[in-house]
Amino acid sequence: MAACTLHALSVTLFLLLFFAVSPAKAQQPYVNNHQLACEVRVYDNITNGFTCNGPPSCRSYLTFWSQPPYNTADSIAKLLNVSAAEIQSINNLPTATTRIPTRELVVIPANCSCSSSSGGFYQHNATYNLSGNRGDETYFSVANDTYQALSTCQAMMSQNRYGERQLTPGLNLLVPLRCACPTAKQTTAGFKYLLTYLVAMGDSISGIAEMFNSTSAAITEGNELTSDNIFFFTPVLVPLTTEPTKIVISPSPPPPPVVATPPQTPVDPPGSSSSHKWIYIGIGIGAGLLLLLSILALCFYKRRSKKKSLPSSLPEENKLFDSSTKQSIPTTTTTQWSIDLSNSSEAFGLKSAIESLTLYRFNDLQSATSNFSDENRIKGSVYRATINGDDAAVKVIKGDVSSSEINLLKKLNHSNIIRLSGFCIREGTSYLVFEYSENGSISDWLHSSGKKSLTWKQRVEIARDVAEALDYLHNYITPPHIHKNLESTNILLDSNFRAKIANFGVARILDEGDLDLQLTRHVEGTQGYLAPEYVENGVITSKLDVFAFGVAVLELLSGREAVTIHKKKEGEEEVEMLCKVINSVLGGENVREKLKEFMDPSLGNEYPLELAYTMAQLAKSCVATDLNSRPSVTQVLTTLSMIVSSSIDWEPSDDLLRSGSLGN
């Protein structure tokens, strides 16, 4: 009896100490990108979940970005093991099957609890079935892609009995979702709930606090942050005093086209007697100028009807035209020249397409490129030019360029897409003037025999830049477009090694009315970058770009070309496709050693093997034979952003902490 009493007292004392000491222990440590290094075990206290330092269970909230196929309350509820009715109610949805727009933030009510099986961490349990429909899934892809970092690969590995190489279709995995209950300190401060928010691109602590009607101080303290630095796609706990409601917010899209801001008219202070007088004077002057310009235009038109040829000499400041061309389009200069255009729709389209572009004289381009000399040749029919002291690239195209290509290039405004600045047509040859890329193409860096090499961080940033450009093409311009010709020679690098995609000659409108699928009999492109469904059946979808992007990523990882021809005995040749090689690298045994052998030798050991493995898995999914198994560009961008974020903090010594499980 005494022994039982003593045991009961011991248990009571332990519980009292646990609940008395834990709240004073501070709040919850921020994961800080450690969730990306699956094999690093030294951060288990952070990556496995939020510590049980409050009540054993509570009402909590998660956030989830709507993304097909999880874009209804019903589908999200099944994925996260929560109530569809509660999701519908809190997010003001008409029905549980109402489609939620892609990238819309969804608030998820969830029951959070602490149990002995969790290892002392708060979590909300979900179950995920490896169906095999999405290719080779891993703990990393399930936690960070499917569940959008609401779990971690470390937590899943610790609570599932299957090894990384044992994951096969049909298995059910426990997915511990990160949640937490308020500590005594937070409760005393008036906070009743904790919400797990996934940091979006461009988010700040103050912005998150404002979004959820919380405070920066509460978020900083609640996540044990020592600075304002938070990383994209990492979970942050947001203390709330009331239950959250629908949040109307979307991730920041690419910057809109830059529009010149009209000059602001100074406003006279109240009581100024001259303000209205000067307005009337200004209106009178404007009307007079408009009348004068109209008269001059009429005279100019009559003069042109009598003499259609251009004057033999032009003012120096207006030497932007090719005097020998038979087509001319008004420019942005002070004098506008008009030459007879044919009545064809293509000519009309070309005229409207380049009205906002600078129109160059052929003689000026000759001078700028040293008469298109070999010394100025960059590659093929592209020449380096110096125009008004600035470098430019002039692309020579035999024949007239299409108005659709010019129209597309003119409206593209993204930092990762090469910018068209000017234009010239002479005797059936078109000259396109682009911004200059000081560091050439990634093909020059990866496949040349020189000593120059790209660092790991440069490579992952290049991959992300290209994904940003494709995401812009597929999702942000109207109508959406497919590049259709992505390859390493068309990925250019500026002076800061930021990537810009070029060569839009075969770009095609993505017709959403045809369910993102088109057919063609004219298959064109470079071997090694063409998706099998395009080569075999002429199928065109946005996944065509995803496939080519995957090949480019494999080039960045390995330094190899998309296609390698091996000479064999008796004159035979063996063609090796990089998109096929990766399957043998990541399959079977000794993955770690095979991956090391696959990596570009010029990198040496200066890269994080775990992140290289994750990037290789991403590339492998992009080049999947089945187009439905390939991720969308948006999904690709999400994973790459996490890899880039983690690579920023990586140091070579970090790999000493990693285990050898990749070779298992």
Curated annotation (Swiss-Prot):
Pfam families in alphabetical order: LysM1_NFP_LYK, LysM2_CERK1_LYK3_4_5, LysM3_LYK4_5, Pkinase
Topology in membrane: Single-pass membrane protein
Stated induction or repression of this protein's expression: Moderately induced by chitin oligomers (e.g. chitohexaose (6-mer) and chitooctaose (8-mer)).
One BP annotation, GO: innate immune response
Location relative to the cell: Cell membrane
Entry GO terms, CC: plasma membrane
Residue sites binding ATP per the record: 357-365, 395
Glycan attachment sites: 45, 81, 111, 125, 129, 144, 213
Disulfide bond annotation, renumbered to this chain: 52-114, 58-181, 112-179
Topology, Cytoplasmic side: 299-664
Annotated keywords: ATP-binding, Cell membrane, Disulfide bond, Glycoprotein, Membrane, Nucleotide-binding, Repeat, Signal, Transmembrane, Transmembrane helix
Residues annotated to bind chitin: 135-141, 164-170
GO MF term (any one): chitin binding
Annotated Protein kinase domain residues: 351-643
All ranges on the Extracellular side of the membrane: 27-277
Notes on the domains: The protein kinase domain is predicted to be catalytically inactive.
Record-linked PANTHER family: LYSM-DOMAIN RECEPTOR-LIKE KINASE-RELATED (PTHR45927), PROTEIN LYK5 (PTHR45927:SF6)
Protein name: Protein LYK5
Organism whose genome encodes this protein: Arabidopsis thaliana (Mouse-ear cress)
